[in-house]
Amino acid sequence: MSSTAAFYLLSTLGGYLVTSFLLLKYPTLLHQRKKQRFLSKHISHRGGAGENLENTMAAFQHAVKIGTDMLELDCHITKDEQVVVSHDENLKRATGVNVNISDLKYCELPPYLGKLDVSFQRACQCEGKDNRIPLLKEVFEAFPNTPINIDIKVNNNVLIKKVSELVKRYNREHLTVWGNANYEIVEKCYKENSDIPILFSLQRVLLILGLFFTGLLPFVPIREQFFEIPMPSIILKLKEPHTMSRSQKFLIWLSDLLLMRKALFDHLTARGIQVYIWVLNEEQEYKRAFDLGATGVMTDYPTKLRDFLHNFSA
């Protein structure tokens, strides 16, 4: 390569790196900041699955009472096309009955067991008396002013349409975010109702990471408004150490290193995209998330997170 060609190549590369760095720090030079209809620091996962039975009205009422900023819940659809709040399509884990929600009418759904495992807390269970699977419309009616984060659990066109209709009926486009880790589900949600903000699918999260590490992210427009990701390191506390291989531990470490990036979070939040990290249940995890620049934390223990935020901001 001639010295002239090398000079132009290095000049171009240098200009790209400088421009990328500047736009990473100041993205509004190129992109209009997204309007934030609400801001959520405190997010109750399944209503707070460590303090009440998950996805029940009792859980949601408790979370709202202590001041949560957002309820996170999961939706399925019954045989008679009722949108219900439940994490699992198959009810064996939660009710002890090996049936699918989609195979039953709403009136036929069995009640939750009185005690359920807390999915993101090892060797921990939660008890509760409210064991009824609620309808999504009940949640909307009970909490008209509370932001709600809806995980569309199955790729079902009727479910997506019904959820959209309920959001519109209760005038909640400005208080709702929906989507799933599945790319196709998120695309269908956006196509069904683009007025409801969407979250990043797993495929889009991986794309964002690729763009970030290559310096291209500052140049790319983003449609989504909510970047919801796990903190990979918490997997280590959920499993017995001796059951994990060295390669598994390395992959968790590497995933955490790549995903938990303050520069990435700062760039996204500067563009008006909220960053939520799930599912964190310990104070050191809360602190790490907020120190990294996360907008909000999703937890099974809303009371614990409320107390932390009170002390953290004091």
Swiss-Prot record:
Residues 1-3, 217-314 are extracellular. Coiled coil: none annotated. Residues 25-195 are cytoplasmic. Keywords: Cytoplasm, Endoplasmic reticulum, Hydrolase, Lipid metabolism, Membrane, Metal-binding, Transmembrane, Transmembrane helix. It is found in: Cytoplasm; Membrane; Cytoplasm, Perinuclear region; Endoplasmic reticulum. It is a multi-pass membrane protein. GO terms for cellular component: endoplasmic reticulum; endoplasmic reticulum membrane; membrane; perinuclear region of cytoplasm. Lysophospholipase D activity is increased by magnesium and manganese and inhibited by calcium in a concentration dependent manner. Loss of lysophospholipase D activity by addition of EDTA. Pfam families: GDPD. SUPFAM superfamilies: PLC-like phosphodiesterases (SSF51695). Residues 40-309 form the GP-PDE domain. Widely expressed with high expression level in testis. Belongs to the glycerophosphoryl diester phosphodiesterase family. Hydrolyzes lysoglycerophospholipids to produce lysophosphatidic acid (LPA) and the corresponding amines. Shows a preference for 1-O-alkyl-sn-glycero-3-phosphocholine (lyso-PAF), lysophosphatidylethanolamine (lyso-PE) and lysophosphatidylcholine (lyso-PC). May be involved in bioactive N-acylethanolamine biosynthesis from both N-acyl-lysoplasmenylethanolamin (N-acyl-lysoPlsEt) and N-acyl-lysophosphatidylethanolamin (N-acyl-lysoPE). In addition, hydrolyzes glycerophospho-N-acylethanolamine to N-acylethanolamine. This is Lysophospholipase D GDPD1.
